[in-house]
Amino acid sequence: MRNRTYTADAEPGDTVTVAGWVHEVRDLGGIAFLILRDTSGKIQVKFEKDEMDDDLVETGLGVHRESVISVTGEVDEEPRAPTGVEVTPESLDVIAEAEAQLPLDPSGKVDAELSTRLDNRTLDLRKDEVKAIFEIRAEVQRAVRDKFRDLRATEINTPKIVATGTEGGTELFPITYFGQEAFMNQSPQLFKQLMVGSGLERVFEVGPIFRAEEHNTPRHLNEATSIDFESAFIDHTEAMDVCEAVVTAAYEAVEENCQDELEALGLEEEFERRPRVPAAHLRGGHRAHQRTGELDEQLVWGDDLPTEGEKALGEDVGEHYFITDWPSEIKPFYIKDHDDDETLSTGFDMMHPNMELVSGGQREHRFDHLVAGFEQQGLDPDAFEYYTKMFKYGMPPHAGFGLGGERLIMTMLGLENIREAVLFPRDRQRLSP
C-alpha cells in the first residue's frame, strides 16, 4: 500500500490511510468505535451513525475481530481516545475477514495455556506483551553484534551440518547426508577456533545450535540460539571481561531503546533493579560447592553442579556471577588446564541467580596437549583431523565463550518458560508449527 500511514504517525488534520487488524469494536448506540492495530500501535476509528453512510457503518461494525482492514479518513485530536487522536472514516475496506471464533484471544482478556499459545503462535504474537518479547530479543541481538564489532570482532557463519560432534557424546541429531552419516551441529566451537587460527583472530556468531538432550524443562530447548565469541591472544580472564561487556551492553540497550516494550510487560520499573554486571567471581568450583548450604554434603569434587546447587548459589549471591577453575575432568577436551595445576581447568561459567547463561574458557592451543585431551576423554583424534591439523600450522593462544540467547532473554525479562522467548520452539514434544 503505497500511501499507507502507520498509526503512530497519524497527526491531527491529516487525511490518512491506515491498515491493520481489528483489535476491538464497541457499539454505544448512536456512536461506535473500532480500534485498529498495526505494528506501530493502535488508533481509534469513530462512527457517528446519524452522519455517516449506512453501508460504511454496517461494514465497520460487522467486521470480526482480527480481520485485516484499511481505513481512509481525517485524523482529529481527541483527548479521550487511547492515543489522543481518532480517524473519522471516509471509506473502509475489509482486506481479509477473520473467523468469528478464534482459538485464542489476542486481546489477552482470556488467558490461554502455553501449549495453546504455541499451537497458535501467529495469533499469540498479536498480543502487545508477546510482541514486546521479540522486539526486545531483536534489540538484544543488535546490541551484542554492535558490541562485538566495537571490540573488532568479525561476524562469521559456521556450518550447521557436520560429520562429527563438537564434544562427542550422544546429544547429537543424526541426519542422512547423501549416503553419509552426518549430524546437526551442537556448537560452533571448533569452527570458531579454526577462524582464530586463520588470521581473523577475533570472531563472533549469533546462530542456531542443536542438542538432542533429554531434558524437557522450562529452561531447556533442543534448538536454541548461541551467541559465540572467540579471540586470539587473550586468556580466560579477558574472555570473562568481554562476556561482562556484552551482557551489560544488552541490558543497557533494552533499557534505553525498549521502554514501550518493557511497559507492555510491566517491567518499566522492575527492570532497572534487575542484576546485570557480574558482581562475584567464585574462584574454584570447589569454593562454589562450599556455598551451597545443605547440599554441600551431597556434592563430590569432580561432579558438575546440579540444578539445586545453582539455585542455592543464586540465592546466596543474588546477582550475576562467575564460577571458575572447574575440575578438568568435567570440561571438554578443548579447554586448557592451568599450567600450575592440571586438575583445574581455565573453564568458567557465568551464572544468573536462576540458571547458567554462559560457558567459556581458555582453549588448548598446543597440538600435543590437544591430542592427549582427546584420548583422555575417549575420543578418536583422527575423527577430528580437519580441526586438529590447524594446530600444527601455528595456532595462537585463544579463549572465548558461548552465551545462551534465549536464556539471556528469559532471565532478563523474568519469563517463566524459555519457550516464551522463542518464536517457534523445538523441544522433545514440539516439532510444529
Swiss-Prot record:
One of its GO terms (cellular component) is aminoacyl-tRNA synthetase multienzyme complex. Its main location: cytoplasm. Pfam families: tRNA-synt_2, tRNA_anti-codon. It catalyses: tRNA(Asx) + L-aspartate + ATP = L-aspartyl-tRNA(Asx) + AMP + diphosphate. Signal peptide: none annotated. Keywords: Aminoacyl-tRNA synthetase, ATP-binding, Cytoplasm, Ligase, Magnesium, Metal-binding, Nucleotide-binding, Protein biosynthesis. GO terms for biological process: aspartyl-tRNA aminoacylation. L-aspartate binds at residues 167, 211, 359, 363. The keyword Membrane does not apply. Binds 3 Mg(2+) cations per subunit. The strongest magnesium site (Mg1) is bound to the beta- and gamma-phosphates of ATP and four water molecules complete its coordination sphere. Coiled coil: none annotated. SUPFAM superfamilies: Class II aaRS and biotin synthetases (SSF55681), Nucleic acid-binding proteins (SSF50249). Belongs to the class-II aminoacyl-tRNA synthetase family. Type 2 subfamily. NCBIfam families: aspS_nondisc, PRK05159.1. PANTHER family: ASPARTATE--TRNA LIGASE, CYTOPLASMIC, ASPARTYL-TRNA SYNTHETASE. Aspartyl-tRNA synthetase with relaxed tRNA specificity since it is able to aspartylate not only its cognate tRNA(Asp) but also tRNA(Asn). Reaction proceeds in two steps: L-aspartate is first activated by ATP to form Asp-AMP and then transferred to the acceptor end of tRNA(Asp/Asn). This is Aspartate--tRNA(Asp/Asn) ligase.
